[in-house]
Amino acid sequence: MKIAVPAFMIASLASLRFTGDVAAMPEGTVCFPNEPLLQVSAPLREAQLVESRLLNLLHFQTLIASKAARCVQAAAGKPVIDFGLRRTHGAEAALLSARASYLAGFTGTATVPGNVRFGIPLFGTMAHSFVQAHDDELEAFETFARTQTDNTLLIDTYDTEAAAGKIVALAHRLKAAGVEIRGVRIDSGNLGEHARLVRAILDAGGLGQTQIFASGNVDEYRLAALRAEGAPIDGYGVGTHVGTSADAPYLDCVYKLHEYAGRARRKRSEHKATWPGRKQVYRYADASQHMLYDVLTLDIQDGTALLEPVITAGRHVQRPVSLDHSRDYCRQQIESLPAVLRALDDSPSYPVTVSPTLRALTSDVDTSTS
């Protein structure tokens, strides 16, 4: 299907400026189904023009941050690094995935533009190809260790435990030159079993301070399993499963009209109905600041209002905050969740109630529209 757009309509975009209002939940806020994350109040063409891009940004980063937060919970305090660049769906997705996962608690990223653009700490290790480019594995280890002071050596290209033995011999020789081997990385096989064997080899060789870093198709469930079995792993690289949000590749994130020409509107499609009017979400917590329930309403209530003004009459009214500030806020938000909602397994739904006034408006809208 082809759509012909008159030239005057295209020309009018040159002078188009956003003149409306935007309210949003602060980045890093824990949110639940049927809650508006962002609200745009503007002339229709201004509001429609930004629809697809807003959905694209909100949907993707909410998806990745949610998956990353689960990995952080499963790692239980051990560092988790974003290794997702090669598996994400495009370069921008990799950059935004690095940002969203850092916001949700990852320690850093291996995606260099994430540091350049957002100041995310950079981490990396050697590649299998680096080892294979040398005729001797030990030579590869020594070259990398001497040139990279913050080194972590990849030891599973050939034989993981044999490589750990080489690391022990190399470490003592390099120590005389003032070079320390900081860590080793295991990227394949039974990570827990390999980690136990490697830890024993390193400890017996006097390398108790050398850390073990694990990667390779890791997600929150594997992290939890490795923790449960007591695997001696000091940190993790997580790529594919977070960068693609493998087991939950989309959210039903939508952008719908709720008021036009001074009248409340709503969609009534089967399984896709929306609530009308300019709504607010209020959050209620107990004395320990753990979340109890949210209310979706048209009224002013005494809870904490989650939608805050960001743009008024086309101008920013909220000062920008740093990514690290949002990261700290996100951590506080996750800590305020009831313990049962921080578990990886199925848990009770968090209560989000709809106020009587909103239900009454919904009934009025249904009565007055056909």
For the regions a language model picked out, list residue spans one by one.
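Short coil/turn segments at secondary-structure boundaries
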Residues: 1, 66-70, 84, 342-349
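Translation machinery proteins
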Residues: 1-21
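Buried, small/hydrophobic-residue-enriched core segments of structured protein domains
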Residues: 13-19, 28-205, 220-222
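Short active-site oxyanion
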Residues: 21, 151, 210-212
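Active-site cofactor/substrate anionic-group-binding motifs, chiefly glycine-
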Residues: 25
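Hydrophobic residues within beta-strands of alpha/beta enzymes
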Residues: 123, 184, 212, 234-236
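Gly/Ser/Thr/Ala-enriched C-terminal appendages of enzymes
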Residues: 203-205, 210, 218-370
